[in-house]
Structures are given as C-alpha cells and as structure tokens.
UniProtKB/Swiss-Prot annotation:
Pfam families given in the database record: Ribosomal_L18A
Protein name: Large ribosomal subunit protein eL20
The family this protein is said to belong to: Belongs to the eukaryotic ribosomal protein eL20 family.
UniProt GO cellular component terms: ribonucleoprotein complex; ribosome
HAMAP family: Ribosomal_eL20
BP GO terms, sorted: translation
InterPro entries named among the record's database cross-references: Ribosomal_eL20 (IPR028877), Ribosomal_eL20_dom (IPR023573)
GO MF terms, alphabetically ordered: large ribosomal subunit rRNA binding; structural constituent of ribosome
Alphabetically ordered keywords of this record: Ribonucleoprotein, Ribosomal protein, RNA-binding, rRNA-binding
Subunit structure: Part of the 50S ribosomal subunit. Binds 23S rRNA.
Amino acid sequence: MEVKVFRVKGTFERLGKKQPFTKEYRALKEEHVRELVYSDIGSKHRVPRTKIWIESIEEIKPEEAEDPVVRRLSLEL
C-alpha cells in the first residue's frame, strides 16, 4: 500500500461564524482523511461533526504540499 497526500478544503461553524480551512494529510484512503479532518478540527476547535463541512478532498503530488511537515515526510521516502 502506498501513502498518498491529500488536500482538504471546507468550512466549520464556531460561535455562529463560519471559518474556512485548508489542510493537508498523508493517508492511505480518502475515507481515512475524512475521519482525520473531523477528529482534528473537532478536537482543536471544539466543533461537533455536524458543524464541519468538507467541500473537497483531492489527491496531490508530494511536491505540491504546502505544509512543510507533510512535504518533508512524503519526500523522504
């Protein structure tokens, strides 16, 4: 199995305001990324899953990653 890099875009609602977000993750499947987003944003911002809206999940090349940690981990392999 190959670990892929995904970019996730969406919004979440906190205190009545919508906040856009863009995150990058390394995972095996798109379903794993979806769970990581819900877990990460939910725990950091205390937002329930029903207030997190994922607009897109796209697979990107490791070189295109903007997050330096994701890029470095992906390119070291």
